[in-house]
Amino acid sequence: MPENSLPHSKLGILLERAKAITTPQLMRALTMHKSSGMRMGQYLVTHGYITEEQLARTLAEQLGLPFVDLAMANIEMSYAKMIPKEYALQHEVLPISHSAGKLTTAVADPTDRTVLQDLKTMTGLSVVPVIATTSAIHDAINRVFHGPGSRPD
């Protein structure tokens, strides 16, 4: 690949280096991202090139944030319910624990600073984001607000 055609996507480069995607898949995703506005990672998941978990783990690596498997996490219900269910679903976030005035919150998109600020305002606590998959966040929200075995809204 010529030097001047190197992609400018660190996420894409990380996925390519991990052999999760090929160079042609990366280039196609970059083109679609630019032409459609669709996030590159979402394009790769939607088209079956990578799994949702591969995307979340790579995003966590890229941003230097922890990845959390919400199916295995011990979610503190009182903190999880500090935000409205509708907000949690719409923004794909869920507070999962609290320590020393900090609210650890599972997020699908840790780059959305507005959501992180909203959470701080709603809870009065500093927010520490951890990354989880969108589907795991939705499943956890349903467990928190409806109990185990409940059907999603």
Regions found by a protein language model. Name each.
Residues M1-E3, M27-M32:
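Short, recurring structural edge motifs at helix starts
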Residues H138-D153:
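Short, low-order "capping/linker" segments at domain edges
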Residues S5-L14, S36-Y43:
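Short, solvent-exposed linear patches
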Residues A29-S36, A71:
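Short acidic/polar beta-strand-loop edge motifs in secreted extracellular
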Residues S126-T133:
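Short hydrophobic alpha-helical runs that function as membrane-insertion/retention elements
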Residues R17, G41-L125, R143, G147:
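Polyanionic, low-complexity intrinsically disordered segments
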